Amino acid sequence: LCQFLEARQKSDLEPQLGSAFDLHGAGFSFCSSANMAKTTRTGLIAFEDGTIFRGRAFGAVATNVGEACFNTSMTGYQEILTDPSYFSQIVTMTAVQIGNYGICPDDVESDGPKVKGFIVREISPVASNWRSNTSIQDYLAEAGIPGIEGVDTRAITKKLRVSGALKACITTEDISEEEAVKRAQEFGGLIGVDFVKEVTAKAAYHWDPEMEQSTPFTVVGTDLRLNEDKTPKPRFKVAAMDFGAKFSIYRKLQHHGFDVHVFPATTSAAEIKAFKPDCVFLSNGPGDPGAVDYAHATVKELIEEYPTFGICLGHQIITHALGAKTFKLKFGHRGGNQPVKNLETGKVSITAQNHGFASTREELEKAGAIVTEINLNDETVEGLRLKDKPVFSVQYHPEAAPGPNDADPLFVDFYNMVAKHVG
């Protein structure tokens, strides 16, 4: 393989790629030669301030607008692409090379890519993974998502860090720089826009109890649905409100002893109550938490009656349900290396995060909530619980996917809280 890649780097084997060398027998899975060759198409990303970055195009021939952001994860690009929280965003990866393990159908976080565009330093010319069935190039092309490689992703990241999140236009079509800048400026942004309705479930459904068995690499370790003597634990019926949930969260809930029933974001409190759940879960999702006011009213009513756990947007919706507010971060927290301190235990965890809004600490405390965790980078709120109700939430992603598993015990905490409440 090393000799193969060395020769590929020298361009000596470009015409033969995927045909003259058959390394499948050695455990390598390569995409076709047509997809591995570097494209001659060009593309660009234009920011609202007129800044232009040009590079090589991959993925779909298309033009999209959205908010530009960056993610510092080294791996997990497939989970990032399919995370509904990225709906309406153009994502830049800070890792140098992306795509080297292809796309695996078992690792998706939704029914397809949700990003508006994807920007990387380099797309790997080889996708080597026995579990993958396609390359990232083909995957994005089929989904209609444009991508650009060969750009200075470090410069883009530094720009967003200094300027804050910017509206942008990504194109792999033949349009002028002036037109691209104009389209970026015309994008409405995220504030005040309800993107949840674009990604929530269309109807209520029962999470497939066999789903976990069909994804053996998602959950590792002891079966937490069993007691120490291997007898089954009680399974609690959870009403999961889908604001744009990642599949990994449902898998984690199931793995930790919950019978997961998913409901669209617009489901009323009366409909949830008629289902008679043991508890409520509030998922992640895209956009401005202040724009989903219908969910604020629903959750305000539900937390009066049911043990509730919220993640990411779900955490922010609890904030609004309590009468507190959220605000937009300068450039957000996106990556698998965010340090979070638990103010009650003093413990620091490294967490996976993906959010552009945060809860206002002063207003939460005035509303009677206890702020339990903060981000050590900027001291924004990362967790809360209520003093007199079985309700807690976190801003980060304890299910990871991708990222560290430091916060996985939160699912155990949720189970134990429900068990105590149900009696």
How would you name each of these model-derived features?
Residues 3-5, 13, 23:
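Short hydrophobic targeting helices and cationic amphipathic motifs
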Residues 274, 278-279, 283-350, 356-358, ...:
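Cysteine-nucleophile active-site neighborhood
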Residues 235-239, 259, 307, 350, ...:
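Residues that mark the start of a beta-strand
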Residues 74, 354-359, 396-403:
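Glycine-rich phosphate/pyrophosphate-binding beta-alpha loops
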Residues 346-389:
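Catalytic beta-strand/loop cores that center a nucleophilic Ser/Cys/Thr
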Residues 18, 25-27:
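Residue-identity detector for glycine
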Residues 37-239, 243-270, 274-275, 289, ...:
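RNA-binding accessory domains that recognize and position tRNA/RNA substrates
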